């Protein structure tokens, strides 16, 4: 659903940009190719929705590994390392304000995934943790968590100017010993939710996969 909302935002931006463009001279025989109208874009979105519930995101054709730096849209991305802890307390990201802390069970462990993002584009980007998704062998998403132990290191969100890097951690609770069956998915378009150049950034709507084995 979050992808649908983001795409609707793209439609709104596209309409605003079209309204601001100057009209061509009526006497000209050849006119520049016009941008699609909002109605046409909405029809395309509706078509995608009917196909599979929400517009399909492209998937990178490579499976990356821990320690590998690769280009993902307007960023260079690296999963530096993955640590495991088998005790301690945590809370769900996005949980209720009064939600109680949880304790790692005997058959569970918490993954602490350290990642680095580098902005290799010309414009600043606003990164956000919603651009990351941990999936199990059945392609099911795992809810992110946080612990006081990683205070100050959690990759929640911020602004990254051109040429700069940011390093932080993501955390998830999984069954003990099952790390090799999990994949971290990074989508630079979803991570950059506040870009001023949305039409360009939508090209970055690609899932990049990093196996955690």
From Swiss-Prot:
<dbReference type="InterPro" id="IPR029050">
    <property type="entry name" value="Immunoprotect_excell_Ig-like"/>
</dbReference>
<keyword id="KW-1003">Cell membrane</keyword>
<feature type="region of interest" description="Disordered">
    <location>
        <begin position="20"/>
        <end position="62"/>
    </location>
</feature>
<feature type="signal peptide">
    <location>
        <begin position="1"/>
        <end position="19"/>
    </location>
</feature>
<feature type="lipid moiety-binding region" description="N-palmitoyl cysteine">
    <location>
        <position position="20"/>
    </location>
</feature>
<dbReference type="InterPro" id="IPR029051">
    <property type="entry name" value="DUF4352"/>
</dbReference>
<feature type="compositionally biased region" description="Basic and acidic residues">
    <location>
        <begin position="26"/>
        <end position="62"/>
    </location>
</feature>
<keyword id="KW-0564">Palmitate</keyword>
<feature type="lipid moiety-binding region" description="S-diacylglycerol cysteine">
    <location>
        <position position="20"/>
    </location>
</feature>
<dbReference type="GO" id="GO:0005886">
    <property type="term" value="C:plasma membrane"/>
</dbReference>
<keyword id="KW-0732">Signal</keyword>
<protein>
    <recommendedName>
        <fullName>Uncharacterized lipoprotein YjhA</fullName>
    </recommendedName>
</protein>
<dbReference type="Pfam" id="PF11611">
    <property type="entry name" value="DUF4352"/>
</dbReference>
<keyword id="KW-0449">Lipoprotein</keyword>
<keyword id="KW-0472">Membrane</keyword>
């Amino acid at each position: 659903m979050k992808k649908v909302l983001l795409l609707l935002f793209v439609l709104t931006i596209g309409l605003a940009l079209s309204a601001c463009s100057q009209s061509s001279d009526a006497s000209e025989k050849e006119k520049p190719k016009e941008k699609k109208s909002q109605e046409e874009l909405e029809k395309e979105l509706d078509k995608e929705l009917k196909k599979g519930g929400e517009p399909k995101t492209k998937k990178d054709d490579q499976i990356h590994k821990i320690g590998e730096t690769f280009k993902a849209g307007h960023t260079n991305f690296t999963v530096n390392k993955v640590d495991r802890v088998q005790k301690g307390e945590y809370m769900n990201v996005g949980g209720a304000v009064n939600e109680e802390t949880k304790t790692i069970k005997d058959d569970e462990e918490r993954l602490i995934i350290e990642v680095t993002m580098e902005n290799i584009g010309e414009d600043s980007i606003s990164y956000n943790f919603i651009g990351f998704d941990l999936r199990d062998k059945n392609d099911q998403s795992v809810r992110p968590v946080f612990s006081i132990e990683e205070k100050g290191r959690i990759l929640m969100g911020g602004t990254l100017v051109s040429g700069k890097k940011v390093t932080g951690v993501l955390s998830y609770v999984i069954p003990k010993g099952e790390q090799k069956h999990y994949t971290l998915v990074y989508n630079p378009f979803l991570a950059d939710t506040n870009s001023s150049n949305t039409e360009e950034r939508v090209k970055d709507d690609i899932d990049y996969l990093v196996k955690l084995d």
